[in-house]
Amino acid sequence: MILLDGKATAAAVREELKKDVDALKDRAGRAPGLAVILVGDDPASQVYVRNKERACADAGIRSEAFRISAQTTQQELEERIAALNAREDIDGILLQLPLPAGLDSQRCLELIDPAKDVDGFHPVNMGKLTLGLPGFRPCTPAGVMTLLERYNLSPAGKKAVVLGRSNIVGKPLALMLGASGPFANATVTVCHSRTPDLAQQCREADFLFVAIGRANFVTADMVKPGAVVVDVGINRTENGLAGDVDFGPVSKVASAITPVPGGIGPMTIAQLLVNTVASWKKRCGV
């Protein structure tokens, strides 16, 4: 069984980006710049933002975190986004979700310049993904694809099952898996709460991707022997953090599996850095 180590892979990605940034920084005239907007004091969001700041520093990216009161108005938040859109030294804008009640997250995401939408959630970038055109890809599914590629695990010609249909993970991941390319070209089935005989669908998967937000939902009897299992879920339980997959028993059946934590979480942040550096290169012409 291969443990798909997202933490180590993400560290390698950061190191590669740092070398790239160091080599091009003089020509560009500045380092890449990422702006992170955090509204309110949600503890989990604060941890995520700190992790992103540390990762940026490792990769040679200058980050600015804008920590805004939960009492901010929609207009104030929109004005902040507009100001960051206008700044030449900012290559990427990330709006940390979820937003406090009363704020329209979709409207805010749509106000971010698509050329700075390094989270990949703007309708323009989602549309480009659907059409197979170049653009920023959502970070979590793109991180999943990078992890598969780094371990030379190609789903091409295989049956891939995606549990979950969210706009953040399930939908874009299904599109990426079914696209043309050496680490795509899968036959994809998307499952959700209304899927009949969900367990049987899972048992037929050569590649099983789980992103439903239910701790230890996928058990060993739902997994085809030798399948590759990617657990995107992270859930807080009384015993600590747990994924959507019952890791211990499933790891005895799968040929490769991601741990939680240390699997897809670090890869999500790594992809954010990849997108930011790509934006910087394009905007600076290097």
From Swiss-Prot:
Family matches, as InterPro entries: Aminoacid_DH-like_N_sf, NAD(P)-bd_dom_sf, THF_DH/CycHdrlase, THF_DH/CycHdrlase_cat_dom, THF_DH/CycHdrlase_CS, THF_DH/CycHdrlase_NAD-bd_dom
* UniProt-annotated binding residues for NADP(+): G164, R165, S166, S193, I234
Give the PROSITE patterns listed for this entry: THF_DHG_CYH_2
Q: What is its EC number?
A: 1.5.1.5, 3.5.4.9
GO CC term, one of those recorded? cytosol
Q: Does the keyword Lyase apply?
A: no
Catalytic activity of the protein: (6R)-5,10-methylene-5,6,7,8-tetrahydrofolate + NADP(+) = (6R)-5,10-methenyltetrahydrofolate + NADPH; (6R)-5,10-methenyltetrahydrofolate + H2O = (6R)-10-formyltetrahydrofolate + H(+)
NCBIfam families per the record?
A: PRK10792.1 (NF008058), PRK14184.1 (NF010781), PRK14186.1 (NF010783)
Q: Which family does it belong to?
A: Belongs to the tetrahydrofolate dehydrogenase/cyclohydrolase family.
Q: What does this protein do?
A: Catalyzes the oxidation of 5,10-methylenetetrahydrofolate to 5,10-methenyltetrahydrofolate and then the hydrolysis of 5,10-methenyltetrahydrofolate to 10-formyltetrahydrofolate.
Cite the record's note on assembly. Homodimer.
The name this protein goes by in its record: Bifunctional protein FolD
